[in-house]
Every structure is written in C-alpha cells, then in structure tokens.
C-alpha cells in the first residue's frame, strides 16, 4: 500500500524511516507537482529534522534521475563528474570548475553538473559564462561536447525541469533540505565515477554509501576539515572512497603529496570575474595557492576517473597538464565548441 503524505509526515515526527518504495512514491508526487506545497514543505522539513537516512536519500535520487533530461554518452571509460554540494560558506573561486579543465587535459572525460551561485558568490555556471562558455546546451549538444572536447557542462535547470515544482517551497523555507544533497547524486550523464565535495563531515559517510546503493563505480566524497567542500590545502580532508563495491573512510593531508599546508583565505572571491581571473591564473601555471589546490583536486579527480592509480600519481599528471599549457588550451576549446550552438 502506498503511503500518504500525511502518514509520511507523521513518520518523520516520530523519527521513523520512510521505506524505499514509499520514498519513491512521495518523491514522484513532489516531482510531478501532485503534492501540495504545504505537505511538500512539511515532509522535507521533517526529513531534515529527523535526519535523512541513506535509503531515503538513495530513493529520492533515483526519482530525480528518472525525471532528468539525460545526456547519452557512448563511452563511459575514464568518465568522471567533479561536483560539490556547495553551501560550505567559503566563498572561494571555482576550484572544481578549474579542475575540470585540468582533468580533461590529462585524459579523463568530465561531465560537470552545476548551477548558478546560491550560497556562493560565483557558481560553476557563472564562472563558465564569464570565460565565454555557452552553458545553455541541449542534452545532445552536451554529449557532442564530451565526445569532442572531453568536457561537457550540464546546466542544472536544463536537465531537471521537474525541480520547478519544488523551487518556490525551497526558496520560501530558506533552510537546507534533502534537495541540497541530491544535486551531486543526479548527474544527467550518469558518470560512474565522481569526486564529490560535501558541506558537512557527516555527509562523507552518507553520500558515499548512497552512491554505493546507486551502483556507482569509483567515487571519492571529500570534506576539508576547515569547512571546504573540496580537497583542502588548509587542513586534513576526510575521504569516503567507493571502489570495487567497497567503502573505505580515511584522512588525507597536503603533506602526504609533498604539498604545503596553507590557509585557503587567499582563494576568496567576490564575484564571477574575480573567480575567472583566479581560475585562469592557476591554469596559466602562475605559482600560488590557487594553482596548488587545483592540482590537488584535479589529481584526486584523475584517480576517481581511473586515469591515475593513486592520488599522488594523479597530482603528477595534473602538474604536467598545467605546465604544458594543455589545461589552459582546454578553456579555449570548450568556448569555441559551445559557441557554435549559441541561440
């Protein structure tokens, strides 16, 4: 028997789990716009208060994937997404976006899934636009971009149209809900490998196990202990790694890879233009913290993509991609390729 929204709400009030099939049903009601805004708001708030379980998040992500406009990629070897939940409040430049160019230059295929900044001063969509990339592509055009350049950017509103049915509720609530952690779990290109940054240490173990349930191959979920949703230079980074169906949790430190631990304060930006300047500086091989943190994150992504056998090997490949100018050339390549689809 299917659960009613009222029964689901009662379940959250009693701090009891909503089971997989029930969560599928409720999420489909929300995504179709068949649940009232009042009930939708109550349920997603109730879930947040009781703390969402791995099963509930996995079921919600399954439905969000169902409703997405998919990008069909022919060859998914060495295929990776580099994404963060955002919401870490660090206001740094777009490290994962910069890492995309380096990772692609070193031989991986990257399907980056992102949006405009909400909590940040500059989301991935904002900085890509500032670089001259056309972010408004159809799914088949994104697939062509991945095949041709090794990179594709999926602008979230183009791929998750059903999210409009919950957008007003989320905006008015103004608090984090399950939807804040679903984005990184719902890559429309179905990248089997992922480097995912999260905004809270508890999410490391949760999100990696959700990805395990969703059938992912090689995933590293990371949380910098200075609060960053990236691999950090300013502190140790918690890692949850899914590989060969098994989950391992551990800590890594910049010194493990011959990098100096330095504060991330110098990475803060006020807007997309400042982020663009810092991103290009890193890709132009200008010495400094920006280049080092991009190298560290791209190296980790190359390990996730199975291009490198370890993070250390990935960092070496990332260094070479930047020093050779290949990473910087990838920016111009993506701009040129996407501009042909300008409407």
Curated annotation (Swiss-Prot):
Anthranilate 1 binds at residues 84, 115. SUPFAM superfamilies: Nucleoside phosphorylase/phosphoribosyltransferase catalytic domain, Nucleoside phosphorylase/phosphoribosyltransferase N-terminal domain. Anthranilate 2 binds at residue 170. Its cofactor is Mg(2+). Binds 2 magnesium ions per monomer. The keyword Glycosyltransferase applies. 5-phospho-alpha-D-ribose 1-diphosphate binds at residues 84, 87-88, 92, 94-97, 112-120, 124. GO terms for molecular function: anthranilate phosphoribosyltransferase activity; magnesium ion binding. GO terms for cellular component: cytosol. It catalyses: N-(5-phospho-beta-D-ribosyl)anthranilate + diphosphate = 5-phospho-alpha-D-ribose 1-diphosphate + anthranilate. It comes from the Bacteria. Belongs to the anthranilate phosphoribosyltransferase family. NCBIfam families: trpD. This is Anthranilate phosphoribosyltransferase. It comes from Burkholderia multivorans (strain ATCC 17616 / 249). The lineage of its organism: Bacteria, Pseudomonadati, Pseudomonadota, Betaproteobacteria, Burkholderiales.
């Amino acid at each position: 028997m299917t659960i009613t929204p009222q029964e689901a709400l009662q379940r959250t009030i009693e701090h009891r789990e909503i089971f997989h099939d029930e969560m599928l049903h409720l999420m489909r009601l929300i995504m179709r716009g068949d649940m009232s805004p009042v009930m939708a708001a109550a349920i997603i708030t109730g879930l947040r208060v009781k703390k969402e379980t791995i099963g509930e998040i996995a079921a919600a992500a399954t439905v969000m994937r169902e409703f997405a406009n998919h990008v069909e990629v022919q060859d998914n070897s060495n295929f990776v997404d580099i994404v963060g939940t955002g919401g870490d409040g660090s206001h740094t430049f777009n490290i994962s976006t910069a890492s995309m160019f380096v990772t692609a230059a070193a031989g991986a295929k990257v399907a980056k899934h992102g949006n405009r900044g909400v909590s940040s001063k500059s989301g991935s969509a904002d900085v890509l636009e500032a670089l001259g990339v056309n972010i408004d592509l159809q799914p088949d055009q994104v697939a062509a971009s991945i095949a041709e350049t090794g990179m594709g950017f999926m602008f979230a509103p183009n791929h998750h149209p059903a999210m409009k049915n919950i957008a007003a509720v989320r905006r008015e609530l103004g608090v984090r809900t399950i939807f804040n952690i679903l984005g990184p779990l719902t890559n429309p290109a179905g990248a089997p490998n992922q480097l995912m940054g999260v905004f809270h240490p508890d999410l490391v173990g949760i999100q990696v196990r959700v990805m395990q349930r969703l059938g992912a191959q090689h995933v590293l979920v990371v949380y910098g202990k200075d609060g960053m949703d990236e691999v950090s230079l300013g502190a140790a980074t918690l890692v949850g790694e899914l590989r060969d169906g098994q989950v391992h949790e551990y800590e890594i430190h910049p010194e493990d890879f011959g990098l100096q631990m330095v504060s991330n304060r110098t990475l803060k930006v006020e807007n997309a233009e400042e982020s663009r300047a810092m991103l290009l500086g890193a890709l132009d091989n200008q010495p400094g913290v920006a280049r080092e943190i991009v190298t560290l994150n791209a190296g980790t992504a190359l390990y996730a993509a199975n291009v490198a056998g370890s993070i250390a090997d990935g960092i070496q490949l990332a260094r070479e991609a930047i020093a050779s100018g290949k990473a910087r050339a990838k920016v111009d390549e993506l701009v040129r390729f996407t501009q042909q689809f300008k409407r």
